[in-house]
Amino acid sequence: MITTLTTKLILTILLTNFVGDQIIQPKKILEAKDDNILIIIMHVVIWSLPILIFCWYYIAIFQEWDILLWWMWCFAFHICIDYLTGAIIKSSIKNKEYYKAVIYIHGQQFLVITFMLITFYYRIMQ
């Protein structure tokens, strides 16, 4: 059961990552004139909606509503990581150091996904 849930979560995260980045292209976010927190929040909301759907699936199976607290922590962590790395990514693109921007973008996605998987697995094992 744990393996099935973890697999579904991983697939949801990967699908979300692809779909979320297609709906709000990172290039548009990175080329924004000002460091707008609303753009970051909008990106995270679209990125997080399928994860929220996964939480409702989890609630339907286990009748445990505290999974929503896990989702909120992941949401907050994602906003913080996006905000902290956003300025670095924008300056890298402005200076035409695209390799740095790509490293930071994938690094931030790796951090968020790792945080989600570790905290989810820890939550299930309790």
Locations of the language-model features?
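N-terminal signal-anchor/start-transfer transmembrane helix
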Residues: 8-26
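Interhelical loop and helix-boundary elements at the membrane-water interface
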Residues: 22-47, 79-120
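Alpha-helical transmembrane segments of integral membrane proteins
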Residues: 4, 8-12, 38-42, 65-73, ...
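Helix-coil boundary and interhelical linker segments in multi-pass alpha-helical membrane proteins
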Residues: 1-9, 52-70, 117-126
